[in-house]
Amino acid sequence: HPEKIESLKDSFKKNKSPEIENIESEKKIFVANSFEVHTKKIIALKDKTAFVIYPKDQKNFNKEKLKIYTQNGFVIENFQQKKLDLPKYFTLQRNGGIKTIISIEENKIALISGSENNCFFASLILLKNGNELMRTKCLPEDLKNNDFNGLGSSNIHLDDFLYLTLGTPEKHISKNSPLAQNNKYLFGKVLKIKKSDVIKKIDNQTETLKIDIFSKGHRVPQGLTRINDSIFNVEHGPKGGDELNLVIENGNYGWPLVSYGTNYLKENGGDGKSINFNHDLNNFNEPLLALVPSIGISSLN
């Protein structure tokens, strides 16, 4: 009974406090083609992190000021753990959990995965009281084929708007894939939300949060950043075809109809079939860069 096993693992992980260790390692230097990166280990954390926040007004780095959110629903500050106030439907099943943290004024909002009455979905939760600000429709795929690693997990602010990525949570092409082209669903999109509307929803739970689709046809858009007034994202392809995109309003990036990757082979749950790869000929936005084979692309800074 794989779903029972998933449920047991979910219950155990949600109640397991993160293990954190204050350490200080020697500095290491990693050399690339045109730059080098100096690193040293300052914290050892065995649990998956969802987001790290550091106050921008700090002149000298102090790791005790780090606020670390873990995927299983804890926040760590000054090396002290605290369990977050999350709804009962919050789930870690199928690689779920907290996927990103959004800051609007003094409010912290979590994008989380949820499970209720055989329905997997995503929602936005106000962390100070656990109130739900938004909930997606149910994912149509069989429970065992969902994979919340594909939910996406990135947000940026530009002018008066919040931009948030939601992917199609799946291991391989499935019933979830076409949602990226379906405007009735939020999955497979870059979403645009007016920040003042979020504040209205926080102040009045009866308000409906207005969410616009900025772009669509995204598979797993895990990285989002802005350079001046331009928005860029990186996303996972299937087997090959990771992408760097310039994201424009009303752009359609083609998933699952086009990709420079292919379906996974049968031993990985796919059928091994190729996918149309020419975006432009099929009236979709071409990526700035497509990577074959995949590099497991994630964040973009």
Regions found by a protein language model. Give the residues of each.
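Acidic, Gly/Ser/Thr-rich repeat motifs that build Ca2+-stabilized beta-propeller blades
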Residues: 2-170, 223-237, 293-301
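Beta-propeller domain segments
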Residues: 2-26, 30-32, 57-69, 96-98, ...
